[in-house]
Amino acid sequence: MDTVGSVKRQGTQRVGFLLMDQFTLVSLSSAIDPLRVANSLSDVELYRWCLIGAGEEEQISSDGVRVKLDHTLTDEIELDLVIVV
């Protein structure tokens, strides 16, 4: 059985989280946290993520929290996976 340290690595996976209007913070944190934990258990960076939205600089969650975006929909970025939140 493979362990975290023995899994064959194919490079850092680039994950984009597309934040919809009124997204829920619990969904976002539930999606990011396993990636963060995997990185902390590994000797290398397995995942890198960014936040994407339609707004200019921030997206507002369903409970009114403003989240700073890393990119907007018009930015050209290379990702391996996009998760819609």
Regions inferred by a protein language model and the residue ranges of each:
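Extended, subdomain-level signal for the structured scaffold at the beginning of enzyme domains
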Residues: M1-V85
